[in-house]
Design a protein with these regions (language model features):
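Basic/aromatic-rich interaction segments and small domains that mediate binding to polyanionic partners
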Residues: 12-38, 80-81, 124-136, 143-225
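Short, Lys/Arg-enriched charge-dense amphipathic segments
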Residues: 69-80, 92-93, 109-119, 175-181, ...
Length: 225
């Protein structure tokens, strides 16, 4: 996660104003189109979920702070479409198609297949021979923040929980490892754990220090204290 993308416990962003389900799903008509474009493009099989997330993280900081939620989605989608050679900057400027992308057209999402495809989802659970390193109830400590293999790379370990102690509350089956999958290094599935952290261990002055924060963390993020 980039610093801008990883906002937990960060100062200077103002209060969070939850809507408690009162706001419409899409505040503007184009928001729904942005979601549809992103989902439909993902079915072209040119990138995976973790690559898509990393594309949004890589937006220029000035753009990321200025863009609305779905503007971030469109900007990240635009960047990855160009990076994968499916769209050119000239096509984006003119609105006129020039590239031959017939080789990926076979994967396009049709109207008839939308409901079934979305219901099927994209499960990230995998079967491996890996034996879980940690057990239920065991105390663990997270590693320092950052992707250990790719400088500035994608990771699902938030900075506010880095180098912190917690306890294992659930041991899940292996799941695709985002730190590898986002950068073309394969799925590299690892055991996934739900780890409980006391709020007082994550932040210096929490309102309720004994509250617990539950995070799903991969085995590579954890070590013995």
């Amino acid at each position: 996660m980039s610093r801008l993308h990883d906002m937990g416990g960060r100062f200077g962003d103002g209060p969070v104003a939850p809507d408690f389900g009162q706001e419409p799903v899409f505040k503007e008509e184009w928001h729904g189109r942005a979601l549809a474009l992103t989902v439909a493009s993902g079915f072209l099989r040119q990138w995976n979920l973790d690559e898509g997330r990393h594309a949004r993280e890589c937006l220029a900081p000035m753009d990321y702070t200025a863009f609305s939620y779905y503007e971030k989605w469109l900007a990240g989608l635009t960047d990855i479409l160009v990076a994968k050679g499916l769209v050119t900057p000239e096509e984006l400027s003119t609105g006129q198609a020039a590239l031959d992308v017939s080789d990926v057209a076979q994967h396009k999402l049709t109207q008839e297949s939308v409901a079934e495809s979305l219901a099927r989802g994209g499960p990230s659970e995998r079967q491996t021979d890996e034996t879980p390193k940690f057990a239920l109830g065991e105390q663990v400590k997270t590693i320092p923040a950052g992707n250990r293999s790719v400088a500035g790379g994608h990771t699902r370990l938030p900075s506010y929980a880095a180098s912190c102690s917690g306890r294992i509350v659930t041991v899940h089956p292996p799941h695709v490892f985002p730190d590898a999958n986002a950068h073309g290094y394969g799925e590299a599935a690892e055991t996934l754990y739900t780890v409980a952290f006391k709020a007082g261990d994550l932040w210096q002055h929490p309102e309720n220090p004994t509250d617990e924060v539950m995070l799903d963390l991969w085995q590579s993020y954890l070590e013995t204290p």
